[in-house]
Amino acid sequence: MDTWTVLLILQASLVLPGAVGTRTNTRTAPTPILRFVAVGDWGGVPNAPFHTAREMANAKAIATTVKTLGADFILSLGDNFYFTGVHDAKDKRFQETFEDVFSDPSLRNVPWHVLAGNHDHLGNVSAQIAYSKISKRWNFPSPYYRLRFKIPRSNVSVAIFMLDTVTLCGNSDDFVSQQPERPRNLALARTQLAWIKKQLAAAKEDYVLVAGHYPVWSIAEHGPTHCLVKQLLPLLTTHKVTAYLCGHDHNLQYLQDENGLGFVLSGAGNFMDPSKKHLRKVPNGYLRFHFGAENSLGGFAYVEITPKEMSVTYIEASGKSLFKTKLPRRARSEHQHRRA
């Protein structure tokens, strides 16, 4: 059975419960659900044809996933344009690496919510923000910002806080195992940290996600980002964040700590790296899944959020489902108590 057939069967199981092997005129209301794709490090190359085979394969697989399962939006986890970002809002890379690649009709009306990676910061991040006024599907309002959604046909809410981890921690070389040493502008870093601290303290949504380019935890080439482990992780833990999503390392990983906080690493949109160099730098028991096969065309994460739980499925660009996990909705008492 080919992988696209598997996706179609999965769609049927999600949308038409009880439909197999039974005849009935009773219609079951569709499950309230919010769906999105999370893909990082997809940004092509700076020379013709300005994309890679992996990026093209991921674009095709994302389109197939959207057609079969649906998606309300796509979350871009940074490194949108290799290797030195873009020059201005009219840079041809927007067309050649983004518009012409993610061009399937199924993707034309799916919005992208974007954040910057370290390679984007080697160019003009303000130009990527300005491109939001040119492309109807490119949404990048500011270096860091909040997204808020309601799960359709429910009162259940989801918040996603999009961070600029490069401004927060400093830049680094994506192809060398190098930690960001210090923020270029300490005042901007402190302002952003104060913002996310205030936002998380006030967050009353049923699911709270935080996204940034650099990982908190990673077993791969770059490993854990010391700056985020020190400054961001305590906030994620204190405020009962559901999951942190990131890229930077060029593979797929899922980690989960002793508090149930999930770490979704999806950095396989354009390159693949099998490194497990920092396996011993991550606490024992955190790693649940790692995929970095060099002969793979990469992949992405597909997230589904219902009133009951959030599921994360890692999908290879071939269409194969690699790993799936579930995270619970935040307990009402947790965030209501913090508001009291």
UniProtKB/Swiss-Prot annotation:
<feature type="disulfide bond">
    <location>
        <begin position="169"/>
        <end position="227"/>
    </location>
</feature>
<dbReference type="InterPro" id="IPR024927">
    <property type="entry name" value="Acid_PPase"/>
</dbReference>
<keyword id="KW-1015">Disulfide bond</keyword>
<feature type="binding site">
    <location>
        <position position="213"/>
    </location>
    <ligand>
        <name>Fe cation 2</name>
    </ligand>
</feature>
<protein>
    <recommendedName>
        <fullName>Tartrate-resistant acid phosphatase type 5</fullName>
        <ecNumber>3.1.3.2</ecNumber>
    </recommendedName>
</protein>
<feature type="binding site">
    <location>
        <position position="82"/>
    </location>
    <ligand>
        <name>Fe cation 1</name>
    </ligand>
</feature>
<dbReference type="Pfam" id="PF00149">
    <property type="entry name" value="Metallophos"/>
</dbReference>
<keyword id="KW-0378">Hydrolase</keyword>
<keyword id="KW-0479">Metal-binding</keyword>
<feature type="signal peptide">
    <location>
        <begin position="1"/>
        <end position="20"/>
    </location>
</feature>
<dbReference type="GO" id="GO:0003993">
    <property type="term" value="F:acid phosphatase activity"/>
</dbReference>
<feature type="binding site">
    <location>
        <position position="118"/>
    </location>
    <ligand>
        <name>Fe cation 2</name>
    </ligand>
</feature>
<keyword id="KW-0964">Secreted</keyword>
<feature type="binding site">
    <location>
        <position position="79"/>
    </location>
    <ligand>
        <name>Fe cation 1</name>
    </ligand>
</feature>
<dbReference type="InterPro" id="IPR004843">
    <property type="entry name" value="Calcineurin-like_PHP_ApaH"/>
</dbReference>
<keyword id="KW-0408">Iron</keyword>
<keyword id="KW-0732">Signal</keyword>
<feature type="binding site">
    <location>
        <position position="248"/>
    </location>
    <ligand>
        <name>Fe cation 2</name>
    </ligand>
</feature>
<dbReference type="InterPro" id="IPR029052">
    <property type="entry name" value="Metallo-depent_PP-like"/>
</dbReference>
<feature type="glycosylation site" description="N-linked (GlcNAc...) asparagine">
    <location>
        <position position="155"/>
    </location>
</feature>
<dbReference type="InterPro" id="IPR051558">
    <property type="entry name" value="Metallophosphoesterase_PAP"/>
</dbReference>
<keyword id="KW-0406">Ion transport</keyword>
<dbReference type="GO" id="GO:0006826">
    <property type="term" value="P:iron ion transport"/>
</dbReference>
<feature type="binding site">
    <location>
        <position position="41"/>
    </location>
    <ligand>
        <name>Fe cation 1</name>
    </ligand>
</feature>
<feature type="glycosylation site" description="N-linked (GlcNAc...) asparagine">
    <location>
        <position position="124"/>
    </location>
</feature>
<keyword id="KW-0410">Iron transport</keyword>
<keyword id="KW-0325">Glycoprotein</keyword>
<dbReference type="GO" id="GO:0008198">
    <property type="term" value="F:ferrous iron binding"/>
</dbReference>
<dbReference type="GO" id="GO:0008199">
    <property type="term" value="F:ferric iron binding"/>
</dbReference>
<feature type="binding site">
    <location>
        <position position="250"/>
    </location>
    <ligand>
        <name>Fe cation 1</name>
    </ligand>
</feature>
<comment type="function">
    <text>Uteroferrin is a phosphoprotein phosphatase, synthesized in response to progesterone. It appears to function in transplacental transport of iron in pig.</text>
</comment>
<keyword id="KW-0813">Transport</keyword>
<dbReference type="GO" id="GO:0005576">
    <property type="term" value="C:extracellular region"/>
</dbReference>
<feature type="binding site">
    <location>
        <position position="79"/>
    </location>
    <ligand>
        <name>Fe cation 2</name>
    </ligand>
</feature>
